[in-house]
Amino acid sequence: MVVQAVAFDIGGVLERVAPPDRWLGKWQERLGLAAAEFQAALAGVDPGDVIKTGGLSEAQYRQRYAAVLGLSGAQVEEFIADMWDWYCGELDHELTRYAASLRPRFATAIVSNSADGARREEQTRYGFAGLFGTIIYSHEVGLAKPDQRIYALLCNQLGVPPDEVVFVDDLQENVDAAIEFGIHGVLHRSTTESIDVIDSLIAT
């Protein structure tokens, strides 16, 4: 086996997860809602968990948030802006520089469970399109991790068999599904550890 491609998750890997008070905690306090009441309202936005597979457009989930929380037009704009600030977190500059340095020796990719609007927001902030050759957003392809079909799509777009791909994700179930598909899965715990593991795999 010779590794030809390395793929990364975004949230929790290339982006550090932001604290909840950047978005939901802030708005629960602002609207004066109890935690249970606030969570019950939010559950009505995406009860079938379909945002990540493209079942709700950005316009649709904006409307739903406005309806369940009773937001005015100006409030929903601010709410969504806060959502994207939270969603995009903080860039892990070290890991992102490392990922970019792998090209052109290796094909590089992103596979992210996402919501409509994510490509725009993350490109604006971090310019991923200039750093990675292949970018797969779940809401755009109708498939989400840990569904193994998204890994099949990754390999197809890369033109590389599974056993020649390394994939880094912070969720065990996503890593396990990738491994079961035949990909070399790496559970992200820290930047240093992930870089060391990738280096060991691409050196073999």
Language model regions located:
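Generic structural signal for small/hydrophobic residues in well-ordered secondary structure
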Residues: 9-12, 54, 102, 110, ...
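A metal-dependent, Asp-based hydrolase signature
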Residues: 48-80
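Short, surface-exposed acidic
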Residues: 31-42, 70-81, 162
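Active-site neighborhood of HAD-like aspartate-dependent phosphohydrolases
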Residues: 1-43, 180-181
